[in-house]
Regions:
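Short, well-ordered alpha-helical segments
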Residues: 39, 51, 55-58, 66-86
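Intrinsically disordered or compositionally simple regulatory linkers and C-terminal tails
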Residues: 1-5
Length: 117
């Protein structure tokens, strides 16, 4: 799978990312590093531990990473979760927003694994 096909599979637009980062090699490097990133697992751990501050921080960090890498569907889902958690109150119903992040994360990782080899 090509890098452009990877972005298409995840529902993202490759061209702006390539333009912003400057080369396919750099985009590939950072996309593959995303597979090792612990932000999503940190989000899951924080929610399991009922740590609202850390959950917000992890959701916000994930949103930023996805913005930089052009992983738009996951960025949008993590942005919605970030807003749900902004008040640092886990009594709000964030389950649907978290499920959307989880689904988009799995789709994104699956697409990236297609270029990993």
């Amino acid at each position: 799978m090509t890098l452009q096909e990877c972005y298409t599979k995840m529902g993202a637009d490759y061209a702006p990312v390539l333009q912003r980062l400057g080369s396919e090699r750099i985009v590939t490097k950072f996309a593959l590093r995303f597979l090792e990133d612990k932000t999503f697992s940190g989000l899951c751990d924080a929610l399991d531990a009922h740590d609202a501050e850390e959950a917000f921080r992890m959701a916000h960090t994930l949103k930023g990473i996805c913005l930089n890498l052009g992983f738009e569907p996951l960025r949008q889902a993590s942005s919605e979760l970030t807003e749900e958690l902004r008040g640092r109150d886990l009594s709000v119903d964030y389950a649907d927003a978290f499920q959307a992040v989880k689904t988009r994360y799995q789709q994104t990782v699956s697409a990236i694994r297609g270029i990993a080899g």
